[in-house]
Amino acid sequence: MMDFTENPGAEAHVFEAPEVRLLERDEIRARRRPRAWFATWLWETAFALAVATPIQTWAGTAWGAHPEGDAPLFREGGRALLAWLGEPGPALPIVVVSTFAVFVVAVLTGQLVFGALVAALSTGVGSRATEPRLATSISAGLRALGACSTASLLAGTLQLGVLASAIFASSFAESWLDDHLGEANAFYVQLTLILVATAMAGAMGVFGDLVKVALVRDVAESSLTRESVSSRTRRALALAFHAIRIHPSLALGAWGWRAALSTLLVGIGALALHKTSLQGGAALGAVVLAHQAIGGARLALRASWLARALKLVTP
């Protein structure tokens, strides 16, 4: 039996558990949070399957008895696909509604997963900053769910508005540009307009991410206090504005190269799928593995960007 009479504080010292704390800027590393990565990957995989299940079931029912399965749907020209989609009956509306419902649920729960991942990236346990429990990160993500969802909705609306305005303006001015600049020059002007709008939408997305990670970090820091969403949002906006004003090239560059690489990976995956879509066996298995590898790599890039964003908004 241990004797604590000589040192009354020894018992408290022995049984004292390390507390979850906010990480300093140089402690934030995405690679140090494998459990959060794995949980996020599981969620993405589960909801990808859930979104694809209605149409996959419908296709299996309609084309399961075909000698080639659903391979005709992927042939060039899309005649079989268009004929199938044009068939009368309630199947298509049911599939569209059910797929959309699952997609909406995925988007909403995605904000919770985002918050949990950022909470795991921004907090640690004890002096060694070990990864917090998954339940602790989910709790922080749940508390930040409303604010993050609102920020995502506003940022997404602004991004779509900018892109839609650019496309509309480009189409509206097409005939005038053709008459005054010539068809070739008009095309380059329209392309430049679309590219500028895309860059603006990307910058809005960067700012939105900075606001959201600042919100989650603030929630994690204020876990024991009750505070209005508006006050937390004001602080998050101030931190995001400060980060984008002081380090604009760092923020945009850190997001930009990761977004470009992520898009390139999607293109590689799509090309591999196109090359092997009509094959089976080992080729199909390789595509499935490649798809999961690409998904994991894109998740790593996303987590890496969020870690960088956290560093930018950490005072």
Task: Locate each region found by the language model.
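Hydrophobic alpha-helical membrane segments
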Residues: 2-315
